Amino acid sequence: MRIIIFLSLLIFNSCSYQSFDKRVNLINNVNDGSFKKVIYDKGFIDIFSLQKIENRQEVQEVIVYIEGDGLSWIDRFTPSSDPTPVDPLTFKLAKLDQNPNVIYLARSCQYIRNNECRKEIWTKLQYSKPVIGLYEEILEEIAQRHSKVHLIGYSGGSVIAMHLASLDKKKVKSVRTIAGNINPNEFTKLLNLSSYQTSINLDLIDDKIKDISQTHYYGSKDKVIPKEIYSNYQDQYLNNSCVQITKVNASHTKGWQKFWKNNYNLLQNC
């Protein structure tokens, strides 16, 4: 029998469960005021964002960080009351980015209270058409204001980053993933888990972004994402100079800040 289990449960493991307010305070404490809060109202739920926009000229590029699944589950059978991350790692990485224009996008129902935020959204529907559609609209708005967009996804946010990269190849110049679940279908097969409910066709995405600069970072100590996902992806694009798979001395949640501090600007030549 397949068991429904998600990245957030694997990551959560033995971490202490903090209240919503405490988790919100964590990201506020990381922010020194250089990032301003923006709420995207694009549909049935709002999306929380923190943004540093120092140059508003249209010609400027922007770096967009997309959060992982967060705290979706407390244990295998108990959904979290909200999916706000226990550790705002993705925003910490965004803070290390010294580019003038940087946007952090939380996932659906993270860092906000909304009457439409039902548990199904972060336990079953995180990659469904209505939810993914919110990020498609956000990307469209961002692309209207910037001539070049670089996407970075952490953990489960990698799927969304890769999907968005396939939609606007004219504006999206690169996609990078960090400890990313870059193939959820293969992930569920390798671990014998229930499949995600998703509107994303990963086979089509892979073909559409094969000519976009891609770097996929995985941790040598990562116990969450099977390394076979990366080796299989690398084999698929063995002769494609646009795609780079890079091993980092990190686990799924630890070691990335040290690495990112000196490598946030690395892009694969394509």
Model-identified regions with their sequence ranges:
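N-terminal cap/lid segment of alpha/beta-hydrolase-fold proteins
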Residues: 23-54
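Gly/Ala-rich beta-loop-alpha elbow adjacent to hydrolase catalytic centers
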Residues: 152-157, 161
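The feature captures the conserved acid-bearing segment of alpha/beta-hydrolase catalytic domains
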Residues: 180, 185-249
